[in-house]
Amino acid sequence: MLLWGRWKVVAGLAGLALSLELLLRYMRRRKPIREVLFFPAPVTCIEPVLYPMKQCSCPLPHTDSAFSRLLLLLLRAQRSLELCVFTFSCPSLARAVLLLHSRGVRVRVITDNDYMAASGSQIGPLRSAGVAVRHDQSSGYMHHKFAVVDGTVVLTGSLNWTVQATQTNRENILITDDRVIVKAYQQEFERLWQEYDPASYDFFPEKENK
């Protein structure tokens, strides 16, 4: 019985070692995400991206583009999507965000207070749908343009979430799953999320004594 018990221990340790080896091999084989998207992007049909099971017969080109790639990366979110964007007026990007929200993905948005009510802003529709939105309360701009997908991938660059930026301007987005970089952006988002908590706003600041 004692010998059999020892063999069970040895077999268990061997199985654990094999599992760890397989895990390490998988991690080494996993291709890191290192990608750059450049804009402007050609106008293409995005319906197959948003709804892959539906057919679309619109006259727009049904081809890949930097914009469709951006949508695909965002729609990968399974648990959470944190957006920190200066201005958000692109209806197609709003559709993607609302689609994630409808799937139960936790979506949080931080934006600039001066631009959230600008003409064409999508912040109102997002809030109406129940998406959590916070904004700054300062004279300086909240000028970030980044997104964190599931806490594992960061999309960051010069791109404002506007039609002009995606279709007209020279812009870029860097995508990476580097853990150090993702952690830094996640921490910055959480820091701003707490800083912009409406409960901490001073709506009636006292005038300085002169």
Curated annotation (Swiss-Prot):
Quaternary data: Homodimer.
Gene Ontology cellular component list: mitochondrial outer membrane
Active-site residues from the entry: H143, K145, D150
Domain notes: In contrast to other members of the phospholipase D family, contains only one PLD phosphodiesterase domain, suggesting that it has a single half-catalytic and requires homodimerization to form a complete active site.
Transmembrane segments: 7-24
Protein name: Mitochondrial cardiolipin hydrolase
Membrane-topology descriptor: Single-pass membrane protein
Major subcellular site: mitochondrion
Function: Presents phospholipase and nuclease activities, depending on the different physiological conditions. Plays a key role in mitochondrial fusion and fission via its phospholipase activity. In its phospholipase role, it uses the mitochondrial lipid cardiolipin as substrate to generate phosphatidate (PA or 1,2-diacyl-sn-glycero-3-phosphate), a second messenger signaling lipid. Production of PA facilitates Mitofusin-mediated fusion, whereas the cleavage of PA by the Lipin family of phosphatases produces diacylgycerol (DAG) which promotes mitochondrial fission.
Reactions catalysed, as given in the entry: a cardiolipin + H2O = a 1,2-diacyl-sn-glycero-3-phospho-(1'-sn-glycerol) + a 1,2-diacyl-sn-glycero-3-phosphate + H(+)
Keyword terms of this UniProt record: Differentiation, Endonuclease, Hydrolase, Lipid degradation, Lipid metabolism, Meiosis, Membrane, Metal-binding, Mitochondrion, Mitochondrion outer membrane, Nuclease, Spermatogenesis, Transmembrane, Transmembrane helix
Domain (PLD phosphodiesterase) ranges: 138-165
Source organism of this protein record: Xenopus tropicalis (Western clawed frog)
UniProt keyword annotation of Transmembrane helix present: yes
Catalytic activity, EC: 3.1.-.-, 3.1.4.-
InterPro entries, A to Z: PLD-like_dom, PLD_domain, PLipase_D/transphosphatidylase
Mitochondrial intermembrane side: 1-6
Gene Ontology MF terms: cardiolipin hydrolase activity; endonuclease activity; metal ion binding; protein homodimerization activity
Subcellular localization, as worded in the UniProt entry: Mitochondrion outer membrane
GO biological process, one term: lipid catabolic process
Cytoplasmic side of membrane: 25-210
